[in-house]
Amino acid sequence: FDIETVKIMKNIADEYGILLKEHNCDYLNFNQISLRKKYGIDAINIAPELGVIQTNLIYTLSKYLKIDKEIEKFQKLVLKKNKWKKWNYNNENNFIKFLSAGHYHFNERLYKDIIFKINKKVDLQKMLNKNIENYLLRLFN
């Protein structure tokens, strides 16, 4: 995080009446986020981190609800598509690869079928909202 560069970029953004957003802010702690706010970053992108939260919740619920075959097929699909390479350079742990890349495949038919089966038994959206809320509360408190 280069404070001097951010100051210059913030001045330019303000001059044109636009907000300044930083990408790749996944897994920052409270102090790192506060520093960005202090120097004028208006928004941060943590979407991939939220994708990990959602993928983990889907995996956990699938195991709990005995949708094992489907989630294992989805996990294999995610690993096969290699999107995890963007996030995992030398990691050989397939579960971490799966968690980090699952969000790229939320539009797959297999994923939608899993969601349908989960929603028959629990309110997935409510659980996901609670998981994300808990994450944000931990981050900002």
Predicted segments with their positions:
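Alpha-helix-loop-beta-strand connector modules within alpha/beta enzyme cores
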Residues: 2-17
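Flexible, acidic glycine-rich loops studded with aromatic residues
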Residues: 14-141
